[in-house]
């Protein structure tokens, strides 16, 4: 009988994002056991072998195996990276509908295993699919997390760090809202060591143009990467690994994830990217940044965009 007990992750979806996330977990020894599920069982078999061969060089031993939905019964975390990609000529609503059907099946299979852990959702549109996972699973909102704007915030901090020649970790700045075109930067609270970044940028000759350029580069980064190499996966995989680390180490770390709002930011019944405290129980609480009027208006527009799409989705009615 296998009596092994440690932090266990089940990864559902072994595409570019999923496999990159799996490598990040093994590379950093964030988990004790990793189970991978995908329809392409032969690719899973190959990746499991490849990852196992990497474990002698990871900080601690990580057990990696191919699995099935029954393996979710004692998992601490189920991470969903599976889903359909948007095809040429396909509308966003078409993609939403297709992925909602996929998620209904996946979440149903996971819950049938008697799973009682935390869901982490990465598939796009992530805010809508995190909401769907919460609805389909019946789990408390604290135990369903979307990757949200964790990658957008990382891109934002990177560009700001380059503008000021400091380490990205020294920049305190967030992108909130939909993980998509309606996201927004919280300039009113962005700072380095307490110094407001927008004020510092505005003091430069080309500062105002640079402010707009930094946000546009942040928002449109995915399009540039997709044009160059077909997809984005390393950045989001590292973001997922960071969320996983915060959960398993019970960090109470503040990360910009997709969380359910129940009055915070003047919004209700929507999963959307906001700062939240992450620990072993999932989302401890949403952190409410005092937004200025312009930011609040943009955030409301972002939330409405998500709600309008969900209102048209038959699978959520």
UniProtKB/Swiss-Prot annotation:
Database matches in InterPro entries: L-lactate/malate_DH, L-lactate_DH, L-lactate_DH_AS, Lactate/malate_DH_C, Lactate/malate_DH_N, Lactate_DH/Glyco_Ohase_4_C, NAD(P)-bd_dom_sf
EC category name: oxidoreductase
Instruction: Name where it mostly resides.
Output: cytoplasm
Biological pathway: Fermentation; pyruvate fermentation to lactate; (S)-lactate from pyruvate: step 1/1
Tell me which Pfam families the record gives: Ldh_1_C, Ldh_1_N
Q: Where does it sit, as one GO cellular component term?
A: cytoplasm
* Listed GO MF terms: L-lactate dehydrogenase activity
- Reactions that this protein is recorded to catalyse: (S)-lactate + NAD(+) = pyruvate + NADH + H(+)
Residue positions binding NAD(+): 16-17, 38, 43, 69, 83-84, 105, 122-124, 147
Instruction: Say which family it is in.
Output: Belongs to the LDH/MDH superfamily. LDH family.
Protein name per its UniProtKB record: L-lactate dehydrogenase 1
Origin organism is Staphylococcus aureus (strain COL)
Lineage here is: Bacteria, Bacillati, Bacillota, Bacilli, Bacillales
Q: Which gene encodes it?
A: ldh1
């Amino acid at each position: 009988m296998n009596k092994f007990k440690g932090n266990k992750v089940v990864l559902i979806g072994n595409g570019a994002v999923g496999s990159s996330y799996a490598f990040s977990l093994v590379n950093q020894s964030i988990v004790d056991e990793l189970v991978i599920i995908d329809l392409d069982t032969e690719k899973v078999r190959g990746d499991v072998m490849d990852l196992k061969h990497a474990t002698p060089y990871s900080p601690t031993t990580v057990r990696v195996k191919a699995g099935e939905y029954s393996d979710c019964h004692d998992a601490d975390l189920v991470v969903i990276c599976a889903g359909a990609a948007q095809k040429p000529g396909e509308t966003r609503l078409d993609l939403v509908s297709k992925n909602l059907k996929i998620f209904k099946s996946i979440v149903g299979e996971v819950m049938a295993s008697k799973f009682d852990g935390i869901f982490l959702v990465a598939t796009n549109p992530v805010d809508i699919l995190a909401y769907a996972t919460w609805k389909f699973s019946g789990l408390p909102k604290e135990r369903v997390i979307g990757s949200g704007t964790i990658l957008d915030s990382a891109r934002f901090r990177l560009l700001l760090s380059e503008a000021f020649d400091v380490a990205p970790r020294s920049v305190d700045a967030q992108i909130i809202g939909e993980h998509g075109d309606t996201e927004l930067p919280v300039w009113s609270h962005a700072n380095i060591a307490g110094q407001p970044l927008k004020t510092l940028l505005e003091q430069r000759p080309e500062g105002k143009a640079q402010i707009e350029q930094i946000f546009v580069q942040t928002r449109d980064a995915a399009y540039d990467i997709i044009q160059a190499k077909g997809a984005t996966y390393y950045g989001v995989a590292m973001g997922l690994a960071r969320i996983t680390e915060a959960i398993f180490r019970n960090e109470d770390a503040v990360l910009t994830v997709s969380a359910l709002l129940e009055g915070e930011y003047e919004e209700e019944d929507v999963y959307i990217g906001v700062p939240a405290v992450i620990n072993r129980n999932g989302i401890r609480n949403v952190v409410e940044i005092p937004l200025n009027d312009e930011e609040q208006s943009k955030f409301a527009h972002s939330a409405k965009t998500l709600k309008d799409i969900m209102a048209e989705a038959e699978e959520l009615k």
